[in-house]
């Protein structure tokens, strides 16, 4: 086997493994972004713990077939970059969606969220969700609200009794 073929097979295996292992994957069209914009995007994604890489579409097609993800081939046209989120489901979608709002040249094509192929609209909807920490704080506030209201009511009753007694 030639070295080039071996390298391509390694890339296909690498992409297939990343597709299987990542919690969410977002595929974008980066056509029209200049070097400074791409550098800024990569920096933001790196800070969020997201891997961002450009692969040849033919190699990604083979990797999606190897990973068992059919239905992505139609989106693998033109300049395509892939963002892999291993730890956080929302991070790739959130960073790319925010960047796309400020830079019209970047468009979200599709995504794979926990093994399910998603449309661009579904990826954008996922990006609008609060982070895990935000959701946990909302849950804590909801759970604390009845206790807080009871404490305020008990305090009001105590103050009322104190006024009547005085």
Curated annotation (Swiss-Prot):
Coiled-coil region list: none
GO biological process: translation
Gene3D superfamilies, per database record: 3.30.70.1730
Any matching Pfam family: Ribosomal_L10
GO cellular component: large ribosomal subunit
InterPro entries: Ribosomal_uL10 (IPR001790), Ribosomal_uL10-like_sf (IPR043141), Ribosomal_uL10_bac (IPR022973), Ribosomal_uL10_bac_type (IPR047865), Ribosomal_uL10_CS_bac (IPR002363)
UniProt GO molecular function: large ribosomal subunit rRNA binding; structural constituent of ribosome
Entries under PROSITE patterns matching the protein: RIBOSOMAL_L10
Claim: Metal-binding is one of the keywords in the record: no
Keywords tagged on the record: Ribonucleoprotein, Ribosomal protein, RNA-binding, rRNA-binding
Domain of life: Bacteria
Biological role: Forms part of the ribosomal stalk, playing a central role in the interaction of the ribosome with GTP-bound translation factors.
Record's subunit section: Part of the ribosomal stalk of the 50S ribosomal subunit. The N-terminus interacts with L11 and the large rRNA to form the base of the stalk. The C-terminus forms an elongated spine to which L12 dimers bind in a sequential fashion forming a multimeric L10(L12)X complex.
Family: Belongs to the universal ribosomal protein uL10 family.
Protein name: Large ribosomal subunit protein uL10
Organism per entry: Shouchella clausii (strain KSM-K16)
Name of the encoding gene: rplJ
């Amino acid at each position: 086997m030639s070295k080039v073929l071996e390298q391509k097979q390694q890339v296909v295996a690498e992409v297939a493994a990343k597709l299987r292992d990542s919690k969410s994957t977002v595929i974008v069209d980066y056509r029209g972004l200049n070097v400074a914009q791409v550098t800024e995007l990569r920096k933001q994604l790196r800070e969020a713990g997201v891997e961002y890489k450009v692969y040849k579409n033919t190699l990604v097609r083979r990797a999606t077939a190897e990973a068992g993800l059919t239905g992505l081939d139609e989106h693998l046209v033109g300049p395509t970059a892939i963002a892999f989120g291993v730890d956080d489901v929302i991070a790739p979608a959130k960073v790319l969606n925010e960047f796309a709002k400020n830079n019209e040249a970047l468009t979200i094509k599709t995504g794979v969220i926990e093994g399910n192929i998603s449309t661009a609209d579904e990826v954008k909807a996922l990006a609008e969700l609060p982070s895990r920490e935000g959701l946990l704080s909302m849950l804590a506030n909801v759970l604390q609200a009845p206790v807080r209201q009871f404490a305020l009511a008990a305090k009001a009753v105590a103050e009322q009794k104190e006024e009547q007694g005085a």
